[in-house]
Amino acid sequence: MGTIVLELDGTHAPITTANFLRYVDQKRLDGTTIYRALNFGDGGGLIQGGTRGNPKRILPPIAHEPTTTTGLSHVAGTVSMTRFTPGTANGDFFILASDIPQLDADPSQPGDNVGYAAFGHVVEGMDIVKRIVAMPTSPTEGEGAMRGQMLAAPVKIISVRRSN
């Protein structure tokens, strides 16, 4: 499909950036897939990919860096780490095709209000992100809130490398 180039923000999100770079440097993302697409129907949404819990690929989880600490926000092009609960992020990430401010930390909200750890943004390849968002999903694949969001044909990540 093409190349997506990310610029990571190690100044504002040092823990999350270092974690992602460990996966890059150890080539743990090579051969994985973009396996999920949440399509809002208006060109917006997100794509998700990475290790998908493969025990041969995952590294220990990292501390959570909420957007209230980093000052980053979930706008179109943001790359962020997936997690179950705070402190469980490892080798899966998502990229936003549109602004989704609900993914930012919001301490005024009840429940799980710490958001997701944004740590960079797309500088090249947003057209590819949007093409993946628009790809067909399986109506039966996925569990819970992700049912129906799993790509019918996941997109292979050939390699992930530092550019300099």
Where are these regions (language model features)?
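Cyclophilin-like peptidyl-prolyl cis-trans isomerases
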Residues: 1-164
